[in-house]
């Protein structure tokens, strides 16, 4: 009986809610979601080609495929300019800025670029190319997975994948990074240093650095050991520019990180996340995941979201 009770307690502690409803075009990879200021329409941007765009009247859908932000690819000269990754879109003074990465799998020959639009619609974007954040085999970081935030009045860009982890650099404006040396925010010392997809979110006097840890794809070829697949993790900081720690006080630079969402039931490898305050469901974390009932290939990935609550100052999937 005692063993049964203990197992039940563990199951309850590790239980996650199923993803929220999604209708229409629900494929997504490294999704980024933003609401248009003029009418509240939701736009979802995803990795692939010139960046996939979908729109919907609500986070639940129905999502409609609109095409690509940059149908002819980017003007950047590093990586694969016709297959752009991990878009991150923000609104500043009447203009939407879409940061994206150009690279190839397993390489540090990478760069981050930016495009602008006033409407968010497909084929309305003007590409400005590289912002000055580029990496190579001689840099400790990989210049992919951009994420923009303003701390106080200063804009910053978070980025990084594997190698020495996640970094942050100050921006001179929305189109270009400063020449300052990027600051290391988080590092995973274990295995092949699987850490990427940073997303920094301010709430309740803290800056929450969410990121994805674990194997992101290739599940149809070989599944990683249980628990080594993608999952969403968090550390927090008072300043947003360093000293990130997890719930147990472990530094994010020392492999720290508290799990927010991991595989469960039919959900496998959730990650590539972001956070948005919705009109009907409050603050939600959104992400892509492989649905075991559909398939484990990248082309089968699904858009997921869950409501977030905060317990003792830490985000919890409701």
Swiss-Prot record:
<feature type="active site" description="Proton donor">
    <location>
        <position position="196"/>
    </location>
</feature>
<keyword id="KW-0732">Signal</keyword>
<dbReference type="InterPro" id="IPR006710">
    <property type="entry name" value="Glyco_hydro_43"/>
</dbReference>
<feature type="glycosylation site" description="N-linked (GlcNAc...) asparagine">
    <location>
        <position position="80"/>
    </location>
</feature>
<feature type="glycosylation site" description="N-linked (GlcNAc...) asparagine">
    <location>
        <position position="277"/>
    </location>
</feature>
<dbReference type="InterPro" id="IPR050727">
    <property type="entry name" value="GH43_arabinanases"/>
</dbReference>
<keyword id="KW-0119">Carbohydrate metabolism</keyword>
<protein>
    <recommendedName>
        <fullName>Probable arabinan endo-1,5-alpha-L-arabinosidase C</fullName>
        <ecNumber>3.2.1.99</ecNumber>
    </recommendedName>
</protein>
<dbReference type="GO" id="GO:0031222">
    <property type="term" value="P:arabinan catabolic process"/>
</dbReference>
<dbReference type="GO" id="GO:0046558">
    <property type="term" value="F:arabinan endo-1,5-alpha-L-arabinosidase activity"/>
</dbReference>
<keyword id="KW-0325">Glycoprotein</keyword>
<keyword id="KW-0858">Xylan degradation</keyword>
<dbReference type="GO" id="GO:0005576">
    <property type="term" value="C:extracellular region"/>
</dbReference>
<feature type="glycosylation site" description="N-linked (GlcNAc...) asparagine">
    <location>
        <position position="188"/>
    </location>
</feature>
<feature type="site" description="Important for catalytic activity, responsible for pKa modulation of the active site Glu and correct orientation of both the proton donor and substrate">
    <location>
        <position position="145"/>
    </location>
</feature>
<feature type="glycosylation site" description="N-linked (GlcNAc...) asparagine">
    <location>
        <position position="72"/>
    </location>
</feature>
<keyword id="KW-0964">Secreted</keyword>
<comment type="function">
    <text>Endo-1,5-alpha-L-arabinanase involved in degradation of pectin. Its preferred substrate is linear 1,5-alpha-L-arabinan.</text>
</comment>
<dbReference type="InterPro" id="IPR016840">
    <property type="entry name" value="Glyco_hydro_43_endo_a_Ara-ase"/>
</dbReference>
<dbReference type="GO" id="GO:0045493">
    <property type="term" value="P:xylan catabolic process"/>
</dbReference>
<keyword id="KW-0326">Glycosidase</keyword>
<feature type="active site" description="Proton acceptor">
    <location>
        <position position="30"/>
    </location>
</feature>
<comment type="pathway">
    <text>Glycan metabolism; L-arabinan degradation.</text>
</comment>
<dbReference type="InterPro" id="IPR023296">
    <property type="entry name" value="Glyco_hydro_beta-prop_sf"/>
</dbReference>
<keyword id="KW-0378">Hydrolase</keyword>
<keyword id="KW-0624">Polysaccharide degradation</keyword>
<dbReference type="Pfam" id="PF04616">
    <property type="entry name" value="Glyco_hydro_43"/>
</dbReference>
<comment type="similarity">
    <text>Belongs to the glycosyl hydrolase 43 family.</text>
</comment>
<feature type="signal peptide">
    <location>
        <begin position="1"/>
        <end position="28"/>
    </location>
</feature>
């Amino acid at each position: 009986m005692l063993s049964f009770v203990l197992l039940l307690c563990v199951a309850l502690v590790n239980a996650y809610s199923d993803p929220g409803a999604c209708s229409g075009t629900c494929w997504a990879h490294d999704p980024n979601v933003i609401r248009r200021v003029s009418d509240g329409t939701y736009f979802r941007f995803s990795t692939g080609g010139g960046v996939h765009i979908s729109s919907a009247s609500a986070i639940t859908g129905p999502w409609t495929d609109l095409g690509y932000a940059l149908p002819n690819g980017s003007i950047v000269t590093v990586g694969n300019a016709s297959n752009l990754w991990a878009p991150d879109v923000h609104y500043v003074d009447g203009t939407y800025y879409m940061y994206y990465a150009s690279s190839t799998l397993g390489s540090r020959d990478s760069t981050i670029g930016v495009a602008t639009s006033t409407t968010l619609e497909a084929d309305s974007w003007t590409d400005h190319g590289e912002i000055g954040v580029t990496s190579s085999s001689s840099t400790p970081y990989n210049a992919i997975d951009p994420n923009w935030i303003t701390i106080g009045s200063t804009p910053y860009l978070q980025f990084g994948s594997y190698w020495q982890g996640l970094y942050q650099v100050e921006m001179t404006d929305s189109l270009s990074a400063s020449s300052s040396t990027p600051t290391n925010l988080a590092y995973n010392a274990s295995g092949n240093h699987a850490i990427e997809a940073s997303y920094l979110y301010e709430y309740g006097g803290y800056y929450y650095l969410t990121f994805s840890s674990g194997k992101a794809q290739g599940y149809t070829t070989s599944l990683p050991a249980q628990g080594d697949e993608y999952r969403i993790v968090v550390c927090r900081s008072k300043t947003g520019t360093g000293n990130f720690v997890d719930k147990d006080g472990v530094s994010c630079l020392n492999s720290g990180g508290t799990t927010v969402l991991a595989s469960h039931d039919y959900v496998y490898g959730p990650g590539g996340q972001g956070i948005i305050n919705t009109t009907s469901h409050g603050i939600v974390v959104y992400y892509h995941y492989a649905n075991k009932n559909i398939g484990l290939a990248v082309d089968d990935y699904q858009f997921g979201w869950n409501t977030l609550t905060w317990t003792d100052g830490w985000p919890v999937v409701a």
